[in-house]
Amino acid sequence: MENPLYNDWSLLLEDEFKKDYYLRLRSFLKKEYTEEKIHPAMEDIFNALHFTPFHKVKVVILGQDPYHGPDQAHGLSFSVQPGITIPPSLKNIFKELTHEFGMSMPTHGHLTHWAKQGVLLLNNVLTVREGKAHSHRGQGWEVFTDKVIQTLNQKDHPVVFLLWGGAAQKKGELIDTNKHIILKAPHPSPLSAYRGFFESNHFSKANQILHKNNVEEIDWTLPESPSQG
């Protein structure tokens, strides 16, 4: 089985691509990408791992599954492609950032600037059918992303996990909290953001934890143009 990764994640996860569950997932995806409209594009599926190598991971933001609208998803949780309207949950994330740092509201939702600094923007499920939320649940991605979380437990310096909502917090059961830090809040969706996501101060708290551990903090502001990210 060909390993689709090309940085330090490649060696760490290479055994996963030989396992039965992944071979079944791969067969399922080949059929889906042939017969249906699937997001993100096949070459973008592993962008979270490609943009944020293992050795650079400082913060993890767990999402559920990719956006299922046209041209939104590009392999990073909560992020959208340049030129795409900022979705409601991401808009609420930006509102929280403006509250915490007094920054102006970003004009785009392309989060590669965060990913390149060490923020792993990982979804629980990495693909979805257009217009059908959660349509690729239970096909094997959850096993793969569990392995990503378990692999992060090996890191020497503390990683800060931002877990928003019940699904992400369930994944948190895999995290070694003797070494790493979990910050929990409701999901930033308009349905739940007012129940404690707003004013959670997760972004500034994450930076405080990094600073305390002599790790460079994240610049949560976004460049004016996505191409500068």
From Swiss-Prot:
Subcellular location: Cytoplasm
A Pfam family that the UniProt record links to this protein: UDG
InterPro entries: UDG_fam1 (IPR002043), Ura-DNA_Glyclase_AS (IPR018085), Uracil-DNA_glycosylase-like (IPR005122), Uracil-DNA_glycosylase-like_sf (IPR036895)
Catalytic reaction equation(s): Hydrolyzes single-stranded DNA or mismatched double-stranded DNA and polynucleotides, releasing free uracil
Keyword field contains Amino-acid biosynthesis: no
UniProt enzyme class: hydrolase
EC number: 3.2.2.27
GO molecular function, one term: uracil DNA N-glycosylase activity
Keyword list, A-Z: Cytoplasm, DNA damage, DNA repair, Hydrolase
Active site (UniProt): 65 (proton acceptor)
GO biological process annotation, one example: base-excision repair, AP site formation via deaminated base removal
Family matches, as PROSITE patterns: U_DNA_GLYCOSYLASE
SUPFAM superfamilies to which the protein is assigned, alphabetical: Uracil-DNA glycosylase-like
This protein's GO CC annotations: cytoplasm
NCBIfam families given in the database record: PRK05254.1-1, PRK05254.1-2, PRK05254.1-4, PRK05254.1-5, ung
Family classification: Belongs to the uracil-DNA glycosylase (UDG) superfamily. UNG family.
Biological role stated in the UniProt entry: Excises uracil residues from the DNA which can arise as a result of misincorporation of dUMP residues by DNA polymerase or due to deamination of cytosine.
Protein name as it appears in the record: Uracil-DNA glycosylase
Provenance organism: Oceanobacillus iheyensis (strain DSM 14371 / CIP 107618 / JCM 11309 / KCTC 3954 / HTE831)
